From Swiss-Prot:
Any one GO molecular-function label of the UniProt entry: holo-[acyl-carrier-protein] synthase activity
Name of the protein this chain belongs to: L-aminoadipate-semialdehyde dehydrogenase-phosphopantetheinyl transferase
Cellular component GO terms held in the UniProt record: cytosol
Family under the similarity heading: Belongs to the P-Pant transferase superfamily. AcpS family.
Role of this protein: Catalyzes the transfer of a 4'-phosphopantetheine moiety from coenzyme A to a serine residue of acceptor proteins, such as alpha-aminoadipate reductase. Necessary for alpha-aminoadipate reductase activity.
Catalytic activity: apo-[ACP] + CoA = holo-[ACP] + adenosine 3',5'-bisphosphate + H(+)
Annotated keywords: Transferase
Enzyme superclass (EC): transferase
Cross-referenced Pfam families: ACPS
Length: 258
């Protein structure tokens, strides 16, 4: 059994992060899509099929599959009562020792899960393709500090601007998800300008802000993942695993077979 799977099933304090590919080619087969969709609760199925674009449907489906798979592993039960906070952050009712956060990216979805008493966590995926030209910098001026704006503006080429912006954005959204407010929060309240984006081939970059530990890493050349948790739990050393959608689907099917 892999380290992350053993940890997720254990009762010991831990933090596990799972990232899953959004396998568009697999879901071009209508049978594969419908089979995976039927694994979800009916209410979730309705939310998935309400999406207009096929890619958005697939992303929503993958998000829910990963949420179901991860939370069932952690809580060792099929009977999970999910609900949402005021600003839409999902959580599990009637549990104080488990929390999680979800994010959708361009080609991936991710979840961070913490088996810790009354502990918030946050996570976000950001793509360099969200920043298409140097002119975009002006559009995002309201969410960047003066120092962040200048650092991006001073990059020597567009690709470096895109990567730095994606890094800043992922940290900011991760933090607001940690707070449970998402995009309803003020993205300027956290200033990331003192930190550099991790290198593409770097395993993980770790830094602290506001007594919170952040981990950032590129999951592809285009997408960066950032997740966070209270700095007091640094000793836990979170485990991050990248899964494929087929293994998650099979995992859901067989989770509680005897």
């Amino acid at each position: 059994m892999s380290d992350w799977l053993s940890l997720a099933k254990s009762n010991d304090p831990h933090i596990v992060v799972l990232t899953m590919d959004v396998h568009l080619s697999y879901f071009r087969d209508e049978y594969n899509f419908e089979e995976a969709l039927r694994l979800l609760p009916f209410e979730w199925q309705c939310r998935v099929i309400q999406k207009r674009a096929h890619k958005d449907k697939v992303t929503a489906l993958c998000n829910r599959l990963l949420q179901l798979y991860g939370c069932r592993l952690e809580l060792n039960t099929q009977a999970i009562d999910f609900t949402q906070g005021k600003y839409g952050k999902p959580f599990v009712k009637n549990t104080e020792s488990f929390n999680f956060s979800m994010t959708n990216g361009e080609n991936f979805v991710s979840i961070i899960m913490a088996n810790l008493f009354q502990t918030e966590v946050g996570i976000d995926l950001a793509s360099i393709n969200d920043f298409t030209s140097e002119g975009d910098l002006k559009i995002y001026e309201d969410v960047l500090s003066t120092e962040e704006y200048e650092k991006i503006n001073n990059q020597t080429n567009l690709l470096d601007m895109k990567r730095l912006f994606a890094f800043y954005w992922s940290v900011k959204e991760c933090y607001t998800k940690y707070l449970g407010v998402g995009l309803n929060g003020d993205l300027k309240i956290i200033n990331v300008s003192l930190f550099s984006a991790p290198l593409i081939n770097e395993a993980v970059s770790t830094f602290k802000l506001k007594d919170i530990t952040f981990h950032s890493r590129w999951v592809s050349d285009n997408e960066i993942l950032t997740y966070c948790f209270p700095a007091q739990y640094d000793f836990l050393k979170p485990i991050h695993a990248i899964l494929n959608v087929v293994s998650v689907i099979e995992g859901i099917k067989t989770q509680f077979l005897t």
